[in-house]
Regions:
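Short, contiguous acidic/charged loop-to-helix segments that flank catalytic cores in large enzymes
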Residues: 25, 285-305, 331-340, 360-365, ...
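Conserved Class I SAM-dependent methyltransferase catalytic core
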Residues: 14, 21, 31, 35-43, ...
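Non-catalytic, mostly N-terminal accessory regions of nucleic-acid modification and defense proteins
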Residues: 1-193, 252-260, 265, 358-361, ...
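Hydrophobic alpha-helix feature that most strongly marks membrane-spanning transmembrane helices
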Residues: 216, 245, 249, 279, ...
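C-terminal, active-site-flanking charged/polar segments
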Residues: 352-353, 363-366, 370-415
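Conserved S-adenosyl-L-methionine
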Residues: 171-276, 281-297, 328-331, 339-353, ...
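Hydrophobic alpha-helical scaffolding
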Residues: 124, 146, 201, 229-233, ...
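Active-site lining segments that contact anionic ligands and/or coordinate catalytic metals
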Residues: 270-271, 305-307, 321-323, 327-329, ...
Length: 501
């Protein structure tokens, strides 16, 4: 049986249910910060306490030695910030002050978190009785299953944003990239030791978490990766800093949040790998003030859509052998409006597009438009060729609204790319095809995978039409007869209790 990704949202739903206790007791603008701060504190305290108890059992007296924790990438938590201290104060009037002090202690312990953690728990707007109830709920949660490999903060926050959007009647933002998409990008790009990884719109930092995990899984050194990110939203930037702190990843997100187009915090960076999920079809991004920008090598992107601004920004930041994996709305594959078709043509003719993967719908919690993975390379192994994959039928339904990839799905996509790069891939009707530049030119430089992979071959139906219709008609007649029998039985039962129909 195919191994499924950690797609179920049971833990996130527990968090959301706990958060709902606070609904109506705190201003909406502060709501998310309060919950995320509690998640962060509960998470790092749980990891710390497990190690602390191990050291106590060993009896060597090292349980307060910071190096014992830092050596295993476990966050050292000062006594006043430990969850046991918070839990003990849950039903006292001072619970807000205790939480604020815990956050200050954590920031003092880790300078990179200065002014990052929320410290609004003592606010008079927050009902302390209700806050204590939420602390109790967090205390009683089983955190044993939240190992480092899960992008807990990002998944939980993204889930909560979708819920907020549903309640408020507005669209949830593209805050977080689902783990199956991140894993697919990383599995195809294969980041290596001593590499520089960059995300110009990093959200909660999930791309970096998965890159580190990939390197570890392939016997690499997690400390050898250099992480660079930028985020324009202040709360999201803080979220990313917290996410990296939890996992012991040393990241450069700049000294503050900033707009990537107007204030490039890593202007001189040339990255080995760039992974990103930029905001889809962003309009009014400030093109009029960036007309002659050095990044627009393949023509200036239009004011009404930033898709090709993101692509060119990333190409600009690539090292000579660098690679990009990014998520874009499907419109970028075929649009001809406002000069976008010309930009796409120029990028294709520069032989930068290595592969395009059409993804299934419903992979995101809160975004329903179809999306595509783009893979761009400065030094392609297969010169003058591009791989097209139609993965729209892959994956499985987690529930009625959400789809995910299995690990086997992700491996199949990665293996297909590797075979293409090695020159051993054979086209598979309806799934994958390799096209040269001349073929793409004949398609007017449109990159929609369906134009190249064709339609999946169907097994020939050997049953003659007349025989099939006779069989199906007979089966339908039997079903109708059974339906009439059931209807008569139901009428009889209802009549027996005085309800004639």
């Amino acid at each position: 049986m195919a191994e499924k990704n950690n797609a179920n949202i049971g833990f996130e739903k527990q968090i959301w249910d706990a958060a709902c206790v606070l609904w109506g007791h705190i201003p909406a603008a502060e709501y998310r910060k309060v919950i995320i701060g509690l998640i962060f504190l509960r998470y790092i305290s749980s990891a710390f306490e497990r190690k602390y108890n191990e050291l106590v059992t060993e009896g060597e007296g090292f349980e307060e030695d910071r190096d014992e924790y830092l050596g295993e990438n476990i966050f050292f938590v000062p006594e006043k910030a430990r969850w046991s201290t918070v839990a003990a104060a849950a039903h006292t009037p001072e619970i807000g002050t205790v939480l604020d002090e815990a956050m200050r202690e954590i920031e003092a312990e880790n300078k990179s978190l200065k002014n990052v953690l929320p410290k609004n728990y003592a606010s008079p707007d927050l009902d302390k009785r209700v806050l204590g109830d939420v602390v109790d709920l967090f205390t009683n949660m089983d955190m044993s299953d939240t190992e480092e490999g899960k992008d807990l903060l990002g998944r939980t926050y993204e889930y909560c944003i979708a819920q907020f959007a549903a309640y408020e009647g507005v669209k949830g933002g593209e805050f977080y990239t689902p783990s199956s998409i991140v894993k697919t990008i990383v599995a195809i790009l294969k980041p290596f030791n001593n590499c520089r990884v960059y995300d110009p719109c990093c959200g909660s930092g999930g791309m970096f978490v998965q890159s580190v995990k990939f390197i570890q899984a392939h016997s690499g050194n997690r400390q050898s990766i250099s992480v660079y990110g930028q985020e324009s939203n202040a709360d999201t930037w803080k979220m990313a800093k917290m996410n990296m702190a939890i996992r012991g990843i040393d990241a450069d997100f700049g000294p503050y949040q900033a707009d990537t187009f107007f204030n490039d915090l890593h202007a001189n960076l040339r990255a080995d790998f760039i992974m990103a999920n930029p905001p889809f079809n962003l309009s009014n991004w400030g093109q009029d003030k960036l007309q002659d920008d050095v990044r627009w090598k393949y023509e200036t992107p239009p004011a009404g859509n930033a898709n090709y601004a993101w692509i060119q920004h990333m190409i600009h930041h690539l090292a000579p052998n660098g690679k990009i994996g990014l998520v874009l709305a499907n419109g970028a594959l075929s649009t001809q409006s406002s000069g976008e078709g010309e930009i796409r043509k120029n990028i294709i003719n520069a032989d930068l597009v290595e592969g395009i993967v059409a993804l299934p719908t419903q992979l995101f919690y809160s975004v329903t438009i179809p999306v595509t993975l783009w893979f761009i390379s400065k030094n392609k192994k297969q010169k003058g060729k591009t791989l097209f994959i139609d993965a729209r039928k892959m994956g499985y339904m987690v529930d009625r609204k959400h789809r995910d990839f299995t690990d086997e799905d992700i491996q199949k996509l990665a293996d297909t790319f590797e075979a293409f790069q090695n020159g051993t891939l054979e086209d598979v009707k309806g799934f994958c095809a390799v096209a040269d530049l001349q073929t793409i030119e004949k398609q007017d430089y449109i990159l929609t995978p369906g134009r190249y992979v064709g339609i999946e071959e169907q097994e020939e139906d050997s049953e003659p039409f007349d025989e099939k219709m006779a069989r199906l008609t007979s089966e339908l007649s039997d079903m109708f007869a059974k339906s009439h029998e059931l209807e008569a039985e139901i009428r009889k039962k209802l009549g027996a209790i005085g309800y004639e129909i």
